[in-house]
């Protein structure tokens, strides 16, 4: 409206949009990126400077840790790890997720809830449950390693040799976890990624629907419109994915009909079904 207010149409009524709703609407349209937003109460002491040094040495061949403090600060500012907010320098959401000492202290929604069930339903007996915490790369590495422990590994006999059946190729599992961490909506503060392993499948449920007018059909053909541009850049530089839009097509090629994408309310769910054994 002319007075700067935004209204949402719900059924036969209109109501003023909340700050959180506006944030998600602007994110979905690609107008703002939450991962470059400042996190209140943070400062440079919340950044693991050794991790930053490792990144800059590996990717840019910059000896970050031995730079003068003012040069370190300028580099953090120029790369959106530090963001100015109300005359103070705060760590960005992406900066915390990539280089924070304790990301979940300020972003509790950024952990992954991991659970393993005995059967194929969430009401079945619980075998294991863990909350996975850490930086984005730690979340990915821990979630993949933990999942591999619980994915069934049946074997068949061919001739005189035992052959292990690979239900979910490692590259597919890793791609699925990377996508969840990289593309979830971190502005939804009460939701965490859910990674559930059942007797017949893996379900990864991420907060937020597809962003920037992406559709289920478009992602099948490698179309991408990232919600979190900071995370995409840094995870790409660290070789957690190749940035060519090949991930989903690769998963479809590997699993065929054993993969499913769906929206569940404001959530995005990826299901990877295990192969059926005779």
Please identify what each model-predicted range represents:
Residues 1-278:
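Conserved N-terminal catalytic/coupling substructures associated with nucleotide/phosphate chemistry
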